[in-house]
């Protein structure tokens, strides 16, 4: 197994991982505060960086440790999920870990028959596309599903990160609903969008269910120590702005409210105040440059922008008032380093309009990406002061 040092079998102690010395910061100070400062709109001493899908399929140590476990088994095994979450932190010295999980884990915990097939993705035994099926699951979520295993994994992971922030993880209601209604991946999301317009009552129940599942999933992570959370809306780009605002945004806001303990079930939360300390909420939507202002309005803290939207244009749309994250084109990871470096520097320059910037990809790490290229990006980011 290769550690962050690149030496076979070596693991750098987590407490020693930090922004590079060129930033002039002590070992613990940036790790504990830098990326969190950026999430809250302040530029720290050097550029924070982490990668979507940094844990998992692209790392040889992941493939070694997962063994014969299925992806969902790995997500729900505290020791294994923790180890996989930590692997990219050790290897790259990124400034945050993100919980190793999958957006369909809440469905699994709700008793839904679901599996993640290699080369295909999440597949349900039966689509959740009828009022009866939706109502059955809504009744379960009304009483709250047991997310104890997620809380255990989160606490365990936080305890060994030694101050490095842990980012929680969940799918946005629309993307989760697409899997529920379609029964698996879809390029067009035709069944989901048809239900949205042709059977609004059932659609609203599906979205209510998805919002509850993802909101409770995030709440379990936040209350167990996650210092920030990111919501992934992989399929939002398939929607017009009107469809997003009218039929999706209210449920994404509901997810955020539930995650932050604003659920309408107590006198305190009815006032709009969180039942527990609010953490930064990051949001990523693919191919959704036309939705940025609508996404901002659901209450997100940091806009994670996909690689198709230049960050200076994104910042202008957001009145230069919102922290940005992104947005390296994953395809550039396969270019020569000097080409990739120019691309990264251009992104950083374009992001200078925003109050703060966290360097990331504009989509997930490809499974065959070069670990060396990702390590070079981290070194470059940490050299910027």
From Swiss-Prot:
PANTHER family: METHYLTETRAHYDROFOLATE:HOMOCYSTEINE METHYLTRANSFERASE RELATED, UROPORPHYRINOGEN DECARBOXYLASE
GO molecular function, one term: uroporphyrinogen decarboxylase activity
Compartment annotation: Cytoplasm
EC category name: lyase
Keyword Acyltransferase (UniProt): no
Residues annotated as site: Transition state stabilizer: 102
Quaternary structure (record): Homodimer.
GO annotation, cellular component aspect: cytosol
Enzyme Commission (EC) number: 4.1.1.37
Keywords in alphabetical order: Cytoplasm, Decarboxylase, Lyase, Porphyrin biosynthesis
Reactions catalysed: uroporphyrinogen III + 4 H(+) = coproporphyrinogen III + 4 CO2
GO terms under biological process: protoporphyrinogen IX biosynthetic process
CDD domains for the chain: URO-D
Organism: Tropheryma whipplei (strain Twist) (Whipple's bacillus)
Superkingdom, taxonomy of origin: Bacteria
Family annotation (NCBIfam families): hemE (TIGR01464)
Protein name, entry field: Uroporphyrinogen decarboxylase
Family: Belongs to the uroporphyrinogen decarboxylase family.
């Amino acid at each position: 197994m290769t550690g962050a040092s690149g030496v076979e079998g070596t693991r750098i102690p987590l407490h020693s991982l930090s922004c590079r010395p060129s930033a002039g910061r002590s070992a613990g100070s940036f790790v504990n505060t830098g990326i969190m400062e950026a999430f809250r709109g302040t530029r720290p001493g050097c550029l924070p960086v982490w990668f979507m899908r940094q844990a998992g399929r692209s790392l040889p140590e992941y493939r070694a440790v997962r063994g014969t476990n299925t992806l969902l088994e790995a997500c729900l095994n505290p020791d294994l999920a923790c180890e996989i979450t930590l692997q990219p932190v050790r290897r790259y010295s990124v400034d945050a870990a993100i919980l190793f999980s999958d957006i369909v884990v809440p469905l699994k915990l709700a008793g839904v028959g679901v599996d993640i097939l290699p080369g295909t993705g999440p597949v349900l035994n039966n689509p959740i596309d009828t009022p009866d099926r939706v109502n059955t699951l809504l009744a379960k979520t009304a009483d709250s599903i047991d997310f104890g295993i997620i809380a255990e994994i989160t606490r365990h992971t936080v305890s060994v990160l030694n101050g490095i922030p842990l980012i929680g993880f969940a799918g946005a209601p629309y993307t989760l609903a697409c899997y529920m209604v379609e029964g698996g991946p879809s390029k067009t999301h035709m069944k989901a969008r048809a239900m949205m317009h042709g059977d609004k009552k059932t659609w609203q129940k599906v979205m209510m269910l998805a919002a509850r599942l993802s909101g409770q999933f995030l709440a379990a992570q936040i209350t167990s120590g996650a210092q920030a959370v990111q919501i992934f809306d992989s399929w939002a780009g398939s929607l017009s702005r009107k469809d997003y605002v009218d039929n999706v945004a209210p449920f994404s806001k509901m997810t955020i409210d539930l995650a932050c303990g604003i659920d309408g079930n107590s006198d305190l939360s009815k006032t709009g105040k969180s039942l527990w300390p609010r953490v930064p909420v990051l949001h990523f939507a693919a191919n959704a440059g036309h939705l940025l202002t609508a996404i901002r309005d659901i209450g997100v803290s940091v806009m994670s922008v996909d690689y198709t939207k230049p960050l200076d244009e994104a910042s202008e749309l957001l009145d230069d008032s919102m922290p940005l994250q992104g947005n390296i084109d994953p395809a550039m990871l396969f270019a020569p380093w000097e080409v990739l470096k120019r691309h990264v520097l251009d992104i950083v320059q374009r992001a200078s309009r925003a109050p703060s910037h966290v360097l990331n990809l504009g989509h997930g790490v490809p499974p065959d990406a070069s670990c060396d290229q990702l390590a070079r990006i981290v070194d470059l980011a940490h050299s910027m002061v």
